[in-house]
Amino acid sequence: MERAPPDGLMNASGALAGEAAAAAGGARTFSAAWTAVLAALMALLIVATVLGNALVMLAFVADSSLRTQNNFFLLNLAISDFLVGVFCIPLYVPYVLTGRWTFGRGLCKLWLVVDYLLCTSSVFNIVLISYDRFLSVTRAVSYRAQQGDTRRAVRKMVLVWVLAFLLYGPAILSWEYLSGGSSIPEGHCYAEFFYNWYFLITASTLEFFTPFLSVTFFNLSIYLNIQRRTRLRLDGGAREAGPDPLPEAQSSPPQPPPGCWGCWPKGQGESMPLHRYGVGEAGPGAEAGEAALGGGSGAAASPTSSSGSSSRGTERPRSLKRGSKPSASSASLEKRMKMVSQSITQRFRLSRDKKVAKSLAIIVSIFGLCWAPYTLLMIIRAACHGHCVPDYWYETSFWLLWANSAVNPVLYPLCHYSFRRAFTKLLCPQKLKVQPHSSLEHCWK
C-alpha cells in the first residue's frame, strides 16, 4: 500500500483534529481526548485482527477435517492478515498519531516491504480461493480427484507470496539507487514511487483491477453454472453439469439385492449354478442367464437331474419362466433406486455449490468495498501530486485495507459450517460434546 507523508492527514479534518496543530519538522499532535480515542480504535483493530486470524490458524491445528486444498488457501490468507495485525498496524500507530517516523530508515524499508507484501498477498489469496471454488463447481470430477494433493496446494501458496513480493519489493528496495537518491524527507516513511503515476497505474492494474475482474468472472461463472443446473433439475433433467451417468448405469448389469448371495447373474450371458439354491430348486438368476443365452435349458439344469427325463425337461423351463417376472421387476426397481440416488446426490451438490457461491460473493463484495476506494484515491492522488484528494480521505481508505484483515476471519464462520464447528471446538468444547449440532447455535448467538 502506498504510504502518504502524514502532514496534516488528520489535521485536514477539523472534526477529527480538534485543537491539533502541525509542529516543526512536520510533526503534529492531537488533543489528549482525540489521541485516546484514536489509540483505542487502533488498538481494537489490532486485537480483532490478531485474535481472529490466530483463531483460524488454531482451527487447522485442532480440526484435521479442515485440512483440505481450499481451506489451505484460507489458511494462507489468515497468515497474511495475522501478520498485518502483528507487524504493520502497530508500527503505523505512533506514526499516524505524531506525524513522524521515529524508527529509522532501515526499519522503514522493512516495514514498507512487509506491508506491501502482506496486502498484495491477501489480494492474490482471494483470487486463488475464488479460482479454486470456481473449479470445484464447474469441474467437480477432476477437482475431487486432486483434493488429496497437498503439495500442489503448497506450491500455489508459495507462488502467491513470490508474486506479491515481486510486484512491489524490488521497487521499494532499489528505487532510490536507480533514481540517484532518496526523495523522502527526514522523519517520514513512504515509498519512493508514491507520486510516480505511471508506476502506480501499472501496479494497481496488477494488484486490484485484474484480481477484481478475475474474482468477478469466477463468481459470475459459478452463478451461471448453478442457474443452468437448477433449470435442468426443475425441468426434470437428471443430469449434472457434466457427462450424464445414466447411460452407464443402464448398460451395466444389475447388482444383487441385499442379502441375496449368489442369486444374480455374474454378467451378460452367464448364469449362476443352481446348486446354490438347493436340490431341485430354481434360483431367480437362472432364468436371467437363460434369457441372455437364448432360453436354452440344458445349461441351467440342476446337477441332481441326471436322468434327463422329458417331464423334468419340460417342467424346468416353465419354472424358470415363472421366475423371470421377479427378476425383471427387481432390475427395474434397482434402476429406479439408482435414479433416485443420483437425484439426491445432484440436489446435495447443487445445494453445496449454492452455498459456495454465496460465501464467495460475500468475500468478493467485502474485498471490493475495502480495496476500491484506496486504489482509486491512490491513482487520483498521484496524478495531481497529492493536491486534489484530502489527506484524511486517503488515510481512511487505506485503514479500510487493514480493516479487511480483521473482517476476513469473521467471514469464515459465517460462510462455512466446517469453520463454525472448528471454532466451536476451540471456544465451546463442552457444549460440542453434549450437543454436537445444536451447540453451534448457542456458541454463535
Curated annotation (Swiss-Prot):
Subcellular location: Cell membrane
Modified sites of kind Phosphoserine: S439
Biased composition (Low complexity): 299-312
Region of interest (Disordered), residue spans: 236-264, 288-336
Tissue: Expressed widely and abundantly throughout the brain. Highly expressed in discrete neuronal populations such as pyramidal cells in cerebral cortex or cerebellar Purkinje cells.
Keyword Cytoplasm in annotation: no
S-S pairs: C108-C189
Membrane topology category: Multi-pass membrane protein
GO biological process: adenylate cyclase-inhibiting G protein-coupled acetylcholine receptor signaling pathway; G protein-coupled receptor signaling pathway, coupled to cyclic nucleotide second messenger
One GO MF term: G protein-coupled acetylcholine receptor activity
Gene3D superfamilies noted in UniProt: Rhodopsin 7-helix transmembrane proteins
TM helices/strands, residue ranges: 41-61, 72-92, 110-130, 158-178, 198-218, 360-380, 399-419
Any one cellular-component term (Gene Ontology): plasma membrane
Superkingdom classification of source: Eukaryota
Glycosylation sites per record: N11
PANTHER family, A to Z: 5-HYDROXYTRYPTAMINE RECEPTOR, HISTAMINE H3 RECEPTOR
Name of the protein in its database record: Histamine H3 receptor
Species this chain originates from: Cavia porcellus
Encoding gene, per UniProt annotation: HRH3
